[in-house]
């Protein structure tokens, strides 16, 4: 179905009004207005404010065709971030595709906490496990410019995405490693081990929304077990590789998951274990000191 027809000219204003008034085509339960604004910004290469400053701007046939293609993909539940190949994280835009997990706002707390834990360290060494798009490692390299940041991913495609983002921001203090860090990590003097590991239990994975389960990489979401296996491996790794006084900083799931993870680090004799809330008031980050 071609929503825009073949002949009529469509302005930004008319397109947005069409979305607001066409509940038959656009599901009322979806926030299509925001999606369309993002699509238009991507196609027209402009900011959201520019859309409303140039409300009468008319899209050409190629732009309308691209917009319709984006809408069709979104109606099949594909995430907006994959469609426009862009996601915001800590005030910066990152390239994303289906090879990497889409950055979430709650993950930004990892950055805040790491900056606090390293503020008195000179040239801290930070390792990001499972870097994906590189949003964590690149942001830390920029925000803590004297840090030496290392980041790994077992997926070469993910490393390619991270490298693309790294080059976009001309980051020089970051080394990307395409290896399994649990099998081979040469550095033995880390100040920070940081990660947003796969923490969704396998039985809960199949209950996720279609835009997640059908598009985002499964390996970034679940450990195919009880959601705790990576935390045990990271706890073991930290005992071996962290400096005395070094920190592990990890995202955790909701519900009982933070308490289950805290018990793991208790069992591995970590000190100063603490849970931190995200911007919604949920415990979503755990820190533990070696």
Q: For the regions a protein language model found, what residue spans apply to each?
A:
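Generic alpha-helical structural context detector
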Residues: 37-41, 69-72, 112, 138, ...
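SAM-dependent Rossmann-like transferase core, predominantly class I methyltransferases
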Residues: 55-57, 65-144, 149-164, 287
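Short, solvent-exposed loop/helix junctions and linker helices
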Residues: 9, 60-64, 101-105, 224-228, ...
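Short, Lys/Arg-enriched, disordered terminal segments
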Residues: 1-28, 62, 116-123, 148, ...
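N-terminal auxiliary segments of SAM/dcSAM-dependent transferases
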Residues: 2-87
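A general structural signal for well-ordered alpha-helical segments in protein cores
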Residues: 16, 36-37, 67, 77-80, ...
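S-adenosylmethionine
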Residues: 146-148, 152-290
């Amino acid at each position: 179905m071609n929503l825009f027809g073949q002949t009529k000219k469509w302005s930004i204003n008319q397109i947005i009004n069409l979305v607001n008034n066409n509940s038959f085509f656009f599901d009322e339960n979806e926030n299509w207005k925001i999606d369309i604004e993002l699509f238009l910004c991507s196609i027209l290469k402009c900011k959201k404010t520019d859309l409303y400053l140039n409300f009468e701007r008319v899209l050409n046939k190629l732009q309308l065709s691209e917009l319709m293609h984006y809408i069709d993909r979104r109606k099949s539940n594909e995430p907006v971030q994959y469609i426009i190949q862009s996601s915001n994280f800590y005030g910066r835009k990152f390239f994303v595709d289906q090879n990497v997990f889409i950055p979430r706002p709650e993950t930004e707390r990892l950055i805040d906490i790491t900056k606090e834990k390293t503020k008195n360290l000179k040239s801290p060494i930070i390792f990001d496990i499972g870097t994906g798009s590189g949003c964590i490692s690149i942001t830390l390299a920029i925000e803590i410019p004297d840090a030496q940041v290392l980041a790994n991913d077992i997926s070469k495609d993910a490393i390619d995405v991270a490298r693309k983002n790294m080059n976009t921001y001309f980051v020089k203090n970051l080394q990307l490693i395409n290896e399994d860090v649990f099998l081979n990590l040469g550095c033995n003097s880390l100040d920070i081990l940081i990660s947003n590991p796969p923490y969704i239990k396998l039985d809960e994975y199949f209950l996720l929304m279609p835009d997640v389960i059908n598009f985002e990489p499964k390996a970034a979401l679940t450990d195919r077990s009880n959601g705790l296996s990576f935390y045990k491996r990271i706890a073991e790794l930290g005992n071996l590789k962290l400096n005395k006084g070094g920190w592990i900083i990890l995202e955790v799931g909701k519900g009982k998951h933070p308490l289950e993870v805290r018990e793991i680090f208790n069992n591995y004799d970590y000190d100063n274990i603490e849970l931190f809330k995200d911007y919604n008031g949920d415990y979503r980050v755990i820190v533990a000191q070696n």
